[in-house]
């Protein structure tokens, strides 16, 4: 079985005194479908570097690595081939940039970018494994300043 490895991030920030996290609506997906930014690990690239890069490419905001949150593992079928995929997620603190201001190179991949209230993110994200990563981020930040 073919294997694929990706990495993504839970980018957290405080906006108007409220903790928030960045979420994307991937291109071609319906309104209201929120996901975490992520992408394939480049050849020779470390997963945590991929996570920081993908978050910036897909949200327009740059984050600082805090820690690994965990992995999501699943099998899917593409063009008749079963693929085992591992996606590693990392907690990132907002550093700079404007959410939603994407370069033309990546704008086609992302239909929308929003800050979601951190405490509501586990309910608002579309995919179960990503909801778990949002919960892990909340637990990791418990009592820690964002």
Spans of model-derived segments:
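N-terminal strand-loop-strand
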Residues: 1-36
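Residue-level marker of positions within ordered structural domains that often coincide
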Residues: 14, 95, 139
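Unchanged
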Residues: 41-132
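A small-molecule sensor/coupling module
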Residues: 133-137
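Short, charged, intrinsically disordered terminal tails
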Residues: 142-146
């Amino acid at each position: 079985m073919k294997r694929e490895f990706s990495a993504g991030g839970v980018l957290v920030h405080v906006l108007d005194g409220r903790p928030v996290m960045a979420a994307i609506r991937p291109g071609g997906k319906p309104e209201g479908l929120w996901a975490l930014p992520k992408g394939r690990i480049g050849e020779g690239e470390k997963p945590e570097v991929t996570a920081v890069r993908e978050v910036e490419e897909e949200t327009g905001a740059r984050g600082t690595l805090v820690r690994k949150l965990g992995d999501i593992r699943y099998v899917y079928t593409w063009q008749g081939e079963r693929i085992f995929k591992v996606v590693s997620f990392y907690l990132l603190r907002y550093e700079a940039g404007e959410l939603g201001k994407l370069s033309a190179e990546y704008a086609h991949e992302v239909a929308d970018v929003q800050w979601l209230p951190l405490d509501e993110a586990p309910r608002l994200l579309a995919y179960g494994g990503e909801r778990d990563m949002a919960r892990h981020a909340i637990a990791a930040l418990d009592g820690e300043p964002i």
